[in-house]
Amino acid sequence: MSRGIIIIGSGFAARQLVKNIRKQDAHVPLTLIAADSMDEYNKPDLSHVISQSQRADDLTRQLAGEFAEQFNLRLFPHTWVTDIDADAHVVKSQDKQWQYDKLVLATGAAAFVPPIAGRELMLTLNSQQEYRACETQLRDAQRVLIVGGGLIGSELAMDFCRAGKTVTLMDNAASLLASLMPPEVSSRLQHHLTDMGVHLLLKSQLQKLEKTEAGIRATLVSQHSIEVDAVIAATGLRPETALARRAGVAVNRGVCVDSYLQTSHPDIYAIGDCAEINGQVLPFLQPIQLSAMYLAKNLLGGSAPLKLPAMLVKVKTPELPLHLAGETQRHDLSWQITAESDGMIAKGMSGEGQLRAFVVSEDRMKEAFALLKTLSV
């Protein structure tokens, strides 16, 4: 492989892939190109930066130069890739171009900002770079509106509340974590956030944001309005697919790949938050770790289809943490819920009596691995 492997991106997926490639081949040329600094940080830490009084720079774990030296890489930070010529095997930026044998898209996903009037007043916390841009405003803000009551929104609401801020959490749905589990299961977290002082605005839709002398006025479709100092969009992620489209590879919600992490072009692959694996977008750490192991083998001449076991998803709400697994979002499951002072176990059973999903909280999380073994997938 004389021209080697190019990876576009520098996040968790790209780094895991580099480490797995180097375990098997110390010498294949590896080049990483990314728009950011390429310094390493732990993205899940962004859910806890406010309560822990962390600045953006405190999150840095390893500088880009150290990473390059450790794994024998060529790095091109602060570099925007503008085009990919898939047939010629060339990646282009404004003033450079690189040839490759194999190309990996690890471009991640961007925070979705609702298309409302005043959307430019919304902040996002999807990267160290984004946090760096707004950390002073967030630290100084006393009244915070978080739009989106999913996994990230719920984590942020608890964190800001623990930091002593006045928090409003808004969602279109009638319950929190609505895309992950039914309301009877998420209600324990919902009640706890309310007890902490988080003001929930459920079944509510934001219409517009306006700058005022006192801060920001958020007006709902119902015409109810609230004054806040900062508004955070936690309304989900959209896989970054623009480069894949330019390369002419198949795209749906994400960059379409098969079990080998291969796109519709045989020498272009995708991994991480940007990838749609056999129809599924899986923006969680464990699938990415496993994808990196299999993709490293395939890039180096192997043929190993990715096999994903039942996996835990963790909701990092420290005062009431949750672990979930299986098809928790299915509407045809019968839920058996045991809730006690030390935690909750909720089992989603199929009509045939099979365990298809579960959610555990607090001290009952220690039972998660035993439940994983009995989960029907």
UniProtKB/Swiss-Prot annotation:
Localisation: Cytoplasm
Catalytic activity: 2 reduced [nitric oxide reductase rubredoxin domain] + NAD(+) + H(+) = 2 oxidized [nitric oxide reductase rubredoxin domain] + NADH
GO molecular function: oxidoreductase activity, acting on iron-sulfur proteins as donors, NAD or NADP as acceptor
Protein name per the record: Nitric oxide reductase FlRd-NAD(+) reductase
Pfam name, any one: Rbx_binding
Function: One of at least two accessory proteins for anaerobic nitric oxide (NO) reductase. Reduces the rubredoxin moiety of NO reductase.
Cofactor: FAD
Enzyme Commission number(s) of this protein: 1.18.1.-
SUPFAM superfamilies membership: FAD/NAD(P)-binding domain
Keywords, comma-separated and alphabetical: Cytoplasm, FAD, Flavoprotein, NAD, Oxidoreductase
Membrane is among the record's keywords: no
HAMAP family linked: NorW
